[in-house]
């Protein structure tokens, strides 16, 4: 299972929020590149990089940080947050993203998101399915939609999506453990999906459980920054 640490960016700094609420922001490091290099030093290969300024302003903002991390580490980066236009996407890939995650755009502008899937392919485009009570949430989680989570994922599988990052918003940044039941349900009903679990990871022991369920990967944020899971533990897990 892929281990994917997260770096969330506000005003160029590495932060974490609780339940996606911008008022709860804690700054963990002024230098995201340093954080990324520390991940790489422990054998980590993947990075989930979120432009929270972008998510709020509906256009790419922190692409310079993406570029720095992409040029100065060999991490495979999936980048998300506010990608709304062909231009945003071009900038993200030109700045060094290996994959991009589309969340709000997949709800609010299906035409453009489906075009991206067909143009760039399913290895490059990840569906961000962020849910609250099994309804999809959009715009940095500030709005709920009427889309039901599992049918939404299935619909995009039919359009060619393979990778799905699913965040249970109620769990995100709360360090109370991930939504095992929700992920079991998705894996049972959206057959063949490459599911990346996100939100709530709080202890190392949860990782083998997510792997057992069949998750393709897991995104870990606050648990690393708060020292609940150490980079050494992750290194040992990756080495196997």
Curated annotation (Swiss-Prot):
Mention one GO molecular function: 1-(5-phosphoribosyl)-5-[(5-phosphoribosylamino)methylideneamino]imidazole-4-carboxamide isomerase activity
> Which CDD domains does the annotation name?
HisA
- A single GO BP annotation from the record? L-tryptophan biosynthetic process
Q: Which reaction does it catalyse?
A: 1-(5-phospho-beta-D-ribosyl)-5-[(5-phospho-beta-D-ribosylamino)methylideneamino]imidazole-4-carboxamide = 5-[(5-phospho-1-deoxy-D-ribulos-1-ylimino)methylamino]-1-(5-phospho-beta-D-ribosyl)imidazole-4-carboxamide
> What does UniProt give as GO cellular component?
cytoplasm
Identify the EC number(s).
5.3.1.16
Gene3D superfamilies on file: Aldolase class I
Task: Give UniProt keywords alphabetically.
Answer: Amino-acid biosynthesis, Cytoplasm, Histidine biosynthesis, Isomerase
Biological or metabolic pathway of the protein:
Amino-acid biosynthesis; L-histidine biosynthesis; L-histidine from 5-phospho-alpha-D-ribose 1-diphosphate: step 4/9
- Residues of the active site are 8, 130
Protein's cellular compartments: Cytoplasm
Enumerate the InterPro entries for this protein: Aldolase_TIM, His_biosynth, HisA_bact_arch, Isoase_HisA-like, Isoase_HisA-like_bact, RibuloseP-bd_barrel
For this chain, the family text in UniProt reads: Belongs to the HisA/HisF family.
| Family annotation (PANTHER family) | 1-(5-PHOSPHORIBOSYL)-5-[(5-PHOSPHORIBOSYLAMINO)METHYLIDENEAMINO] IMIDAZOLE-4-CARBOXAMIDE ISOMERASE (PTHR43090:SF2)
What is the name of this protein? 1-(5-phosphoribosyl)-5-[(5-phosphoribosylamino)methylideneamino] imidazole-4-carboxamide isomerase
Q: Which organism is it from?
A: Flavobacterium johnsoniae (strain ATCC 17061 / DSM 2064 / JCM 8514 / BCRC 14874 / CCUG 350202 / NBRC 14942 / NCIMB 11054 / UW101) (Cytophaga johnsonae)
What is the taxonomic lineage of the source species? Bacteria, Pseudomonadati, Bacteroidota, Flavobacteriia, Flavobacteriales
Q: Which gene encodes it?
A: hisA
């Amino acid at each position: 299972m892929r281990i994917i640490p997260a770096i969330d960016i506000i005003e160029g700094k590495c932060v974490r929020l609780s339940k996606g609420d911008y008022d709860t922001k804690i700054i963990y490091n002024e230098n995201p590149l340093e954080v990324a290099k520390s991940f790489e030093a422990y054998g980590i290969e993947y990075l989930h990089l979120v432009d929270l300024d972008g998510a709020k302003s509906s256009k790419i903002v922190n692409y310079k940080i993406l570029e720095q991390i992409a040029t100065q580490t060999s991490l495979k980066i999936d980048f998300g947050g506010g990608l709304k236009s062909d231009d945003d996407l071009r900038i993200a890939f030109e700045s060094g993203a290996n994959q991009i995650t589309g969340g709000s755009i997949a709800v609010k502008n299906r035409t453009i998101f489906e075009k991206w899937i067909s143009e760039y392919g399913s290895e490059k485009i990840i569906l961000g399915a962020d849910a609250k009570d099994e309804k999809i949430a959009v715009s940095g989680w500030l709005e709920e939609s009427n889309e039901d989570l599992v049918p939404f994922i299935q619909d995009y599988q039919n359009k060619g999506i393979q990778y799905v990052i699913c965040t249970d918003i109620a769990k995100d940044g709360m360090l109370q453990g991930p939504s095992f039941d929700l992920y079991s349900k998705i894996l049972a009903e959206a057959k063949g999906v490459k599911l990346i679990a996100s939100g709530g990871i709080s202890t190392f022991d949860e990782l083998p459980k997510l792997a057992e369920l069949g998750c393709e990967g897991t995104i870990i944020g606050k648990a690393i920054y708060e020292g609940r899971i150490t980079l050494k533990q992750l290194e040992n897990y990756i080495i196997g």
